[in-house]
Amino acid sequence: MKVSIEEMVQVGMHFGHQSRKWNPKMAPFIYTERNGIHIIDLIQTHAYLKQVSQFLTESSAAGKTILFVGTKKQASGLIAKVALQCNSPYVNQRWLGGMLTNWKTIQTSIKKLNEFDYQEKTGGFDLLSKQEAAQARKEKARLQKYLGGMKHMTTIPDVVVIVGQPDELNAVAECRRLGIRSVTILDTDCDPSLADLFVPANDDSVASIQLILTEFLRSILNGQQMFSEKQQRGKKTA
């Protein structure tokens, strides 16, 4: 792992929420309180980040699908950027109820979005009346907004990376219901009992989120490289 504790300090990863807004379950990961703000223990953060990074490498090396989720404004753009860099699906606008637990319905909507994409590329919209074309484009834009990051996903994911737990409790609940492993960045207002693996850290600072997600990306790409090499070896021996 390339991230150092010094880098964590530089991006303010140790700053939690106001002490009155804390979740007592995060007490083991809090170093102290300063001016009414909880300070996260970065020695633990570093250890947990290393553990999660190893897990993501192993998951990618096994060919598992990793879904990124983060709709809060500080995370939304970073979620899309990182997911696209490792060809992973993502949700960064709004979690629609049943995105995982009602997967068949979501699959139908994704299929419709892909059909709209094909129609638009092949001039299919030009064959419609102005009103029909306008309606089709409006529906395509709506589907693209909420499902665009999942349009190449064919099955429910094996792992879900979540940024902003308090805002993504529906996603958390669906993961728990289906037994999908979740990886979460936990600020001092979060609940560690709802995450399978986690990194205690500031989830409100763009710089903090970016540093963690960049490490996640590095780990996933390493795993994907291992998976690709394993497949190539399999072809040679076949």
Swiss-Prot record:
Q: Mostly located where?
A: plastid
Q: Which Pfam families match?
A: Ribosomal_S2
Q: Name one GO molecular function term.
A: structural constituent of ribosome
Cellular location of this protein? Plastid, Chloroplast
In terms of CDD domains, this protein maps to:
RPS2 (cd01425)
Q: What InterPro entries would the database entry show?
A: Ribosomal_uS2 (IPR001865), Ribosomal_uS2_bac/mit/plastid (IPR005706), Ribosomal_uS2_flav_dom_sf (IPR023591)
Can the keyword Ribonucleoprotein be found in this entry's annotation? Answer: yes
Q: Which GO terms describe its cellular component?
A: chloroplast; mitochondrial small ribosomal subunit
Q: Which GO terms describe its biological process?
A: translation
Question: Which controlled-vocabulary keywords does the entry list?
Answer: Chloroplast, Plastid, Ribonucleoprotein, Ribosomal protein
Read off the HAMAP family from this record: Ribosomal_uS2_B
Family assignment from sequence similarity = Belongs to the universal ribosomal protein uS2 family.
> Which named protein is this?
Small ribosomal subunit protein uS2c
